[in-house]
């Protein structure tokens, strides 16, 4: 039974999304429907957690807007996500960055991962 579910879910997985990690700064472009109109809204911030795997995979992005912390959780393979851009790679040692919730300003920054 498990193999059947995995086979069905594998067909619906998206392959056009980049491979990002915890601590990366990403721009998530989300389709927003308001009445009959549809537009694309961008949400930029730091990835503080990734959860589950397969079709049910989600990730949470955090940013500070007007002095107030805003977190938004997105389903990875949902059709409402138009695209994801990685703006900066982060260097972290934790799988979940919940400690960023308590920090403000420069203390809430994640070190940048330098690639050669």
Swiss-Prot record:
It holds the Pfam family Ribosomal_L19. One of its GO terms (biological process) is translation. It comes from the Bacteria. The keyword Cell membrane does not apply. Signal peptide: none annotated. Keywords: Ribonucleoprotein, Ribosomal protein. One of its GO terms (molecular function) is structural constituent of ribosome. GO terms for cellular component: cytosolic large ribosomal subunit. NCBIfam families: rplS_bact. Belongs to the bacterial ribosomal protein bL19 family. This is Large ribosomal subunit protein bL19. It comes from Clostridium botulinum (strain Alaska E43 / Type E3). The lineage of its organism: Bacteria, Bacillati, Bacillota, Clostridia, Eubacteriales.
